[in-house]
Amino acid sequence: MYTQPLKSPLQAPQRGDARSGPEPRDAPASEMQERFESKLSAERKIEPQDWMPEAYRKSLIRQISQHAHSEIVGMLPEGSWITRAPSLKRKAILLAKVQDEAGHGLYLYAAAETLGIARTQMLEALHSGRAKYSSIFNYPALT
């Protein structure tokens, strides 16, 4: 699998671009809020290390972790089908599907971690019922 570096040597950072580094944290909050909103208005990327309002960061963490939880919970019904698959080929297909869903969840957990939350915190929230996931997985999966 290919990865992309955060800073490409082929692209020179532009002034005000997210690649030019994080926002100065010593600026007044109103000025930082203005910069943040101007970036959004200009449809520029907001990187995890950039300044953002705490409510915005929490919302991103909630959305990304909910998506990650849904990927992980979504593989559970398919995992129970593996032993019931009629052939080795179908078992391999189900295994690949489960592995794919797990990989999606892990990528999303890693993305949420860049926003400043630990994976253990997200999993504890899921296990305690404080975090949500897609409810489609609560219905019986007929085989």
Task: Identify the function of each model-found stretch.
Residues Y2-T143:
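Non-heme di-metal
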